[in-house]
Regions:
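Single, function-defining residue in the core of a domain
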Residues: 2-117, 125-132, 137-468
Length: 468
């Protein structure tokens, strides 16, 4: 039996909260002073218009740049204060969906060689200096990123490297809090916490049981297995899965991965069991989980077989249900793309600031900027027919249209697909037949030109008015 992954439903225009400007993403920000709030609005727009450039280049002018540096250095300004209004805006988008996947992951930010930055910690080797970033990204099953729900950064001494599993447990606790908040506010959205192998922690499984025992609602979870755990029925998870009947096959396109892994088509067989796990330490309850084995039986010659074991609290009995959970897990790739945009597009590892606290404040701005690029990319792919004014300001899309088409813009906003392709063409996208939708790199480069186009069109209008 061969069965492709379930087709996703395409959301309609009413599904989305408009995200016209980066400044609106931090609407309601409270940095303790109206002038600081105003500076934050200006700064995120300036950085967002030139995300690949240094802060002085993006801001422009010594006085403006000094004001930006002063904001990042101010003790009343903190990363969570900057991100909080974006979290709130993201929550409003989350409420409009029946299922939202909350993917978490940790990435290193390497500042080795920048010894003048005060407060850096060690990374995986004692001579590597930097900090860690652990965001929670809200993603729909259609792979559209709705925004950040949480984000933490930290530094550590080398000897504390093994103590960071607590970040994953705390992350799940935070997702449960958001699920409870949604319930309190009358929203029926189902949240599914998602993590890769680093999140395979029995404490997370037990945490959900304890929350439910208190009579509170808890978030569901879907985690890739790292440990071949003991079960209460005897034997380990893997051996029991291999004995389970095959539900069928699925076929999907695997994106390019780390190292030299190429993008390719993958066909996997699916097996599933429901099994009680033996607690990993005293004091933890027995937790019954669903385990799904997705195994590539016949990989291409020279390629390693793609296989995963996924664990979840959700019931999975049919091929359709197992396929859905695997499709959800593949959505986790969006957080990897987010990290790529943050590092390669926003170049956050090149920040030249005096203290790690200022780095963290700058990271808060750049995370929102990186999310918007990811949102544009995936929204354009999944919903190309939506009007572009959902995500572009009027002067933005009109300026891009004028410069590209050399004609007056239409009264009705063009589609997202048309405008994003125009933007990406200024980032190297050739828009040839069969090229598909632009990727995030060409979009973030093209977005940097949009600001210049807007300024040029506005300057031309001023000159015309003066002549009249």
């Amino acid at each position: 039996m061969n069965n492709n992954l379930p087709a996703v439903s395409v959301p309609n225009e009413s599904t989305f909260v408009e995200t016209c400007t980066l400044a609106e993403e931090i609407s309601g920000i409270d940095l303790g002073d109206k002038r600081r709030n105003s500076r934050a609005f200006t700064m995120i727009e300036q950085l967002g218009s030139q995300p690949s450039n240094s802060i002085p280049t993006a801001i422009g002018g010594w006085s403006e740049t000094q004001s930006a540096y002063n904001l990042l250095a101010n003790e009343q300004v903190g990363a969570q204060k900057i991100l909080e209004p974006h979290y709130n805006t993201t929550l409003q988008r989350v409420k409009q969906h029946s299922v939202v996947l909350l993917a978490q992951d940790t990435t290193e930010l390497d500042y080795t060689g920048k010894s003048d930055i005060v407060g850096l910690g060690t990374l995986n080797y004692e001579n590597r200096r930097g900090l860690y970033l652990h965001p929670t990204l809200a993603i729909t099953p259609e792979r559209i990123s709705l925004g950040l729900m949480d984000s933490w950064s930290w530094t550590r001494p080398f000897e504390n490297a093994d103590k960071e599993s607590i970040r994953w447990v705390e992350g799940y606790e935070r997702v449960c809090e958001i699920q409870q908040q949604l319930q309190t506010e009358g929203a029926s959205t189902q949240l599914v916490y998602m993590a890769d192998r680093e999140g395979d922690l029995y404490d997370i499984f037990a945490k959900r049981e304890r929350v439910m025992q208190r009579g509170e609602i808890a978030a569901d979870w879907l985690i890739r297995s790292k440990h071949d755990r003991n079960t209460e029925e005897g034997g380990k998870i893997r051996s029991l899965l291999e004995k389970a009947p095959c539900l069928g096959e699925i076929t999907f396109n695997l994106p390019k991965g780390r190292g030299n892994r190429k993008a390719r088509s993958v066909t996997q067989t699916l097996r599933t069991i429901s099994i009680p796990l033996s607690p990993s330490k005293d004091g933890l309850p027995v937790v019954t989980v669903t385990a799904i084995l997705a195994q590539e039986e016949l990989p291409p010659k020279g390629e390693k077989p793609i296989q995963w074991i996924l664990l979840t609290n959700l019931t999975v009995q049919t091929l359709e249900e197992a396929s859905e959970k695997l499709d959800w897990y593949l959505c986790r790739w969006q957080i990897e793309v987010f990290f790529k945009i943050l590092k390669s597009g926003c170049k956050v590892e090149e920040l030249q600031l005096e203290h790690v606290d200022r780095i963290e404040n700058a990271l808060a701005f750049y995370q929102i900027i990186a999310w918007r690029v990811l949102y544009l990319t995936m929204l354009g792919r999944e919903c190309p027919e939506l009007p572009c004014d959902l995500v572009f300001e009027k002067q933005e899309w009109q300026a891009v249209y004028i410069v590209t088409k050399k004609e007056h813009p239409p009264e009705t906003p063009p589609s997202i697909d048309e405008i994003v392709r125009m933007v990406a063409s200024y980032g190297g996208f050739l828009n040839r037949k069969g090229d598909g939708f632009p990727g995030p790199q060409t979009i973030w480069i093209g977005l940097q030109r949009c600001r210049d186009f807007v300024l040029g069109v506005e300057a031309q209008k001023v000159l015309i008015e003066r002549r009249l």
